Protein backbone atom coordinates (compact mmCIF):
# COMPACT_ATOMS: atom_id res chain seq x y z
CA UNK A 1 0.00 0.00 0.00
CA UNK A 2 1.37 3.38 -0.98
CA UNK A 3 1.48 5.88 1.85
CA UNK A 4 0.90 9.51 0.99
CA UNK A 5 2.81 11.99 3.10
CA UNK A 6 0.44 14.96 3.10
CA UNK A 7 3.02 17.39 4.48
CA UNK A 8 5.44 16.60 1.65
CA UNK A 9 2.78 16.52 -1.04
CA UNK A 10 1.26 19.90 -0.27
CA UNK A 11 3.43 22.92 0.40
CA UNK A 12 1.85 26.18 1.49
CA UNK A 13 3.12 29.53 0.32
CA UNK A 14 1.78 32.78 1.77
CA UNK A 15 1.85 35.39 -0.97
CA UNK A 16 -0.27 38.15 -2.42
CA UNK A 17 -2.54 37.57 -5.39
CA UNK A 18 -0.37 39.98 -7.39
CA UNK A 19 2.76 37.98 -6.57
CA UNK A 20 1.01 34.74 -7.49
CA UNK A 21 -0.28 36.02 -10.84
CA UNK A 22 2.92 37.87 -11.75
CA UNK A 23 5.06 34.75 -12.05
CA UNK A 24 7.00 34.86 -15.32
CA UNK A 25 5.60 32.58 -18.03
CA UNK A 26 2.74 31.35 -15.84
CA UNK A 27 -0.30 29.77 -17.45
CA UNK A 28 -3.27 28.52 -15.41
CA UNK A 29 -5.03 25.39 -16.68
CA UNK A 30 -8.52 24.61 -15.39
CA UNK A 31 -9.26 20.86 -15.63
CA UNK A 32 -12.46 19.96 -17.47
CA UNK A 33 -14.05 18.49 -14.33
CA UNK A 34 -14.05 21.94 -12.74
CA UNK A 35 -17.28 23.85 -13.23
CA UNK A 36 -17.45 26.66 -15.75
CA UNK A 37 -17.13 30.23 -14.57
CA UNK A 38 -20.43 30.82 -12.84
CA UNK A 39 -20.13 33.65 -10.34
CA UNK A 40 -23.10 35.99 -10.17
CA UNK A 41 -23.29 39.57 -8.91
CA UNK A 42 -23.66 38.43 -5.28
CA UNK A 43 -20.39 36.48 -5.42
CA UNK A 44 -18.58 39.38 -7.08
CA UNK A 45 -19.99 41.87 -4.56
CA UNK A 46 -18.69 39.68 -1.73
CA UNK A 47 -15.22 39.58 -3.30
CA UNK A 48 -15.24 43.36 -3.66
CA UNK A 49 -16.28 43.69 -0.01
CA UNK A 50 -13.35 41.49 1.01
CA UNK A 51 -11.00 43.63 -1.07
CA UNK A 52 -12.42 46.82 0.41
CA UNK A 53 -12.08 45.59 3.99
CA UNK A 54 -8.49 44.59 3.37
CA UNK A 55 -7.61 47.95 1.85
CA UNK A 56 -9.28 49.73 4.76
CA UNK A 57 -7.20 47.69 7.21
CA UNK A 58 -4.05 48.78 5.42
CA UNK A 59 -5.21 52.42 5.41
CA UNK A 60 -5.90 52.26 9.17
CA UNK A 61 -2.44 50.87 9.84
CA UNK A 62 -3.74 47.54 11.06
CA UNK A 63 -1.41 45.69 8.70
CA UNK A 64 2.32 45.88 9.36
CA UNK A 65 4.69 47.39 6.81
CA UNK A 66 6.24 44.07 5.85
CA UNK A 67 2.85 42.51 5.07
CA UNK A 68 1.13 45.32 3.17
CA UNK A 69 -0.18 43.02 0.51
CA UNK A 70 -3.70 41.82 -0.22
CA UNK A 71 -3.51 38.40 1.44
CA UNK A 72 -7.11 38.00 2.53
CA UNK A 73 -8.76 36.32 -0.44
CA UNK A 74 -8.59 32.78 0.86
CA UNK A 75 -6.67 29.72 -0.26
CA UNK A 76 -5.74 28.99 -3.85
CA UNK A 77 -4.73 25.39 -4.65
CA UNK A 78 -2.64 24.68 -7.74
CA UNK A 79 -0.54 21.76 -8.93
CA UNK A 80 2.51 22.23 -11.15
CA UNK A 81 1.95 20.34 -14.41
CA UNK A 82 5.27 19.28 -15.91
CA UNK A 83 3.85 16.70 -18.34
CA UNK A 84 2.57 18.35 -21.50
CA UNK A 85 0.69 15.16 -22.37
CA UNK A 86 -1.74 16.06 -19.60
CA UNK A 87 -2.67 19.29 -21.39
CA UNK A 88 -5.32 18.77 -24.08
CA UNK A 89 -5.55 20.08 -26.69
CA UNK A 90 -2.03 21.45 -26.99
CA UNK A 91 0.03 23.53 -29.40
CA UNK A 92 3.58 22.58 -28.48
CA UNK A 93 4.88 25.89 -29.83
CA UNK A 94 2.74 27.85 -27.39
CA UNK A 95 3.06 26.05 -24.07
CA UNK A 96 3.91 28.43 -21.21
CA UNK A 97 7.10 27.74 -19.28
CA UNK A 98 5.13 27.26 -16.06
CA UNK A 99 1.76 25.50 -16.13
CA UNK A 100 -0.29 25.31 -12.96
CA UNK A 101 -3.47 23.29 -12.76
CA UNK A 102 -5.98 25.37 -10.87
CA UNK A 103 -7.66 22.99 -8.43
CA UNK A 104 -9.38 25.38 -6.05
CA UNK A 105 -9.97 29.11 -6.34
CA UNK A 106 -10.69 29.30 -10.06
CA UNK A 107 -13.83 31.40 -9.59
CA UNK A 108 -11.91 33.99 -7.57
CA UNK A 109 -8.88 34.01 -9.86
CA UNK A 110 -11.09 34.24 -12.96
CA UNK A 111 -13.00 37.15 -11.45
CA UNK A 112 -9.78 38.95 -10.54
CA UNK A 113 -8.52 38.46 -14.12
CA UNK A 114 -11.73 40.00 -15.47
CA UNK A 115 -11.48 42.86 -12.98
CA UNK A 116 -7.95 43.51 -14.24
CA UNK A 117 -9.25 43.92 -17.79
CA UNK A 118 -11.82 46.46 -16.56
CA UNK A 119 -9.13 48.44 -14.72
CA UNK A 120 -6.82 48.24 -17.74
CA UNK A 121 -9.52 49.61 -20.03
CA UNK A 122 -10.37 52.41 -17.63
CA UNK A 123 -6.76 53.45 -17.05
CA UNK A 124 -6.06 53.55 -20.79
CA UNK A 125 -9.16 55.68 -21.32
CA UNK A 126 -8.00 58.11 -18.62
CA UNK A 127 -4.50 58.29 -20.11
CA UNK A 128 -5.88 59.07 -23.56
CA UNK A 129 -7.93 61.95 -22.16
CA UNK A 130 -4.86 63.71 -20.73
CA UNK A 131 -3.28 65.84 -23.45
CA UNK A 132 0.51 66.25 -23.79
CA UNK A 133 0.11 69.95 -22.96
CA UNK A 134 -1.30 69.09 -19.54
CA UNK A 135 1.26 69.70 -16.73
CA UNK A 136 0.55 66.26 -15.25
CA UNK A 137 0.80 64.41 -18.57
CA UNK A 138 4.16 62.75 -17.83
CA UNK A 139 3.08 61.65 -14.36
CA UNK A 140 -0.14 60.16 -15.71
CA UNK A 141 1.77 58.37 -18.47
CA UNK A 142 4.19 56.93 -15.92
CA UNK A 143 1.38 55.72 -13.67
CA UNK A 144 -0.41 54.10 -16.60
CA UNK A 145 2.81 52.49 -17.80
CA UNK A 146 3.55 50.99 -14.39
CA UNK A 147 0.05 49.76 -13.65
CA UNK A 148 -0.99 48.59 -17.10
CA UNK A 149 2.22 47.25 -18.64
CA UNK A 150 3.94 46.01 -15.50
CA UNK A 151 1.09 44.84 -13.26
CA UNK A 152 -2.43 44.54 -14.65
CA UNK A 153 -1.43 42.90 -17.94
CA UNK A 154 0.27 40.08 -16.06
CA UNK A 155 -2.91 39.29 -14.13
CA UNK A 156 -4.82 38.15 -17.23
CA UNK A 157 -2.05 37.31 -19.71
CA UNK A 158 1.49 36.00 -20.04
CA UNK A 159 4.19 36.84 -22.58
CA UNK A 160 5.05 33.79 -24.68
CA UNK A 161 7.77 35.73 -26.48
CA UNK A 162 6.58 34.59 -29.90
CA UNK A 163 3.45 34.33 -31.97
CA UNK A 164 0.79 36.82 -32.96
CA UNK A 165 0.19 38.28 -30.48
CA UNK A 166 2.97 37.37 -28.09
CA UNK A 167 0.63 37.89 -25.15
CA UNK A 168 -1.64 34.92 -24.41
CA UNK A 169 -4.59 34.44 -22.04
CA UNK A 170 -3.31 33.41 -18.62
CA UNK A 171 -6.29 31.12 -17.95
CA UNK A 172 -7.62 28.35 -20.20
CA UNK A 173 -10.02 25.45 -19.71
CA UNK A 174 -9.14 21.83 -20.53
CA UNK A 175 -10.60 20.42 -23.78
CA UNK A 176 -12.17 23.78 -24.64
CA UNK A 177 -9.15 26.03 -25.06
CA UNK A 178 -5.50 25.77 -26.00
CA UNK A 179 -2.65 28.21 -25.94
CA UNK A 180 -1.77 28.91 -29.55
CA UNK A 181 1.12 30.55 -31.31
CA UNK A 182 -0.68 31.91 -34.38
CA UNK A 183 -4.27 30.66 -34.59
CA UNK A 184 -7.16 33.08 -34.17
CA UNK A 185 -8.79 33.74 -30.82
CA UNK A 186 -12.03 32.04 -31.84
CA UNK A 187 -10.17 28.95 -33.09
CA UNK A 188 -8.13 28.47 -29.92
CA UNK A 189 -10.33 29.74 -27.10
CA UNK A 190 -13.94 28.58 -26.99
CA UNK A 191 -14.72 28.93 -23.28
CA UNK A 192 -16.41 32.23 -22.50
CA UNK A 193 -13.68 33.42 -20.12
CA UNK A 194 -10.65 32.61 -22.26
CA UNK A 195 -12.34 33.85 -25.43
CA UNK A 196 -12.98 37.23 -23.81
CA UNK A 197 -9.40 37.42 -22.52
CA UNK A 198 -8.09 36.50 -25.97
CA UNK A 199 -10.11 39.22 -27.70
CA UNK A 200 -9.17 41.77 -25.03
CA UNK A 201 -5.48 40.99 -25.47
CA UNK A 202 -5.75 41.18 -29.27
CA UNK A 203 -7.44 44.59 -29.08
CA UNK A 204 -4.84 45.82 -26.59
CA UNK A 205 -1.95 44.74 -28.81
CA UNK A 206 -3.61 46.16 -31.95
CA UNK A 207 -4.42 49.41 -30.11
CA UNK A 208 -8.07 49.15 -31.09
CA UNK A 209 -11.23 49.56 -29.00
CA UNK A 210 -11.03 47.31 -25.95
CA UNK A 211 -14.07 45.07 -25.43
CA UNK A 212 -16.25 45.55 -22.37
CA UNK A 213 -17.78 42.91 -20.16
CA UNK A 214 -21.46 42.40 -20.94
Regions found by a protein language model. Give the residues of each.
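Glycine- and hydrophobic-rich flexible loops that cap the catalytic core of alpha/beta enzyme folds
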Residues: 2-214
Amino acid sequence: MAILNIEKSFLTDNRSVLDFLNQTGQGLYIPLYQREYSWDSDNIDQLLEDLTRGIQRIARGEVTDDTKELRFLGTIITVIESNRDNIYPVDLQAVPSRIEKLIDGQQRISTIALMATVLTKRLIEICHKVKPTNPIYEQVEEICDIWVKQKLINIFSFDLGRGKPKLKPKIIRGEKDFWTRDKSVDEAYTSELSNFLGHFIQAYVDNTILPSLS
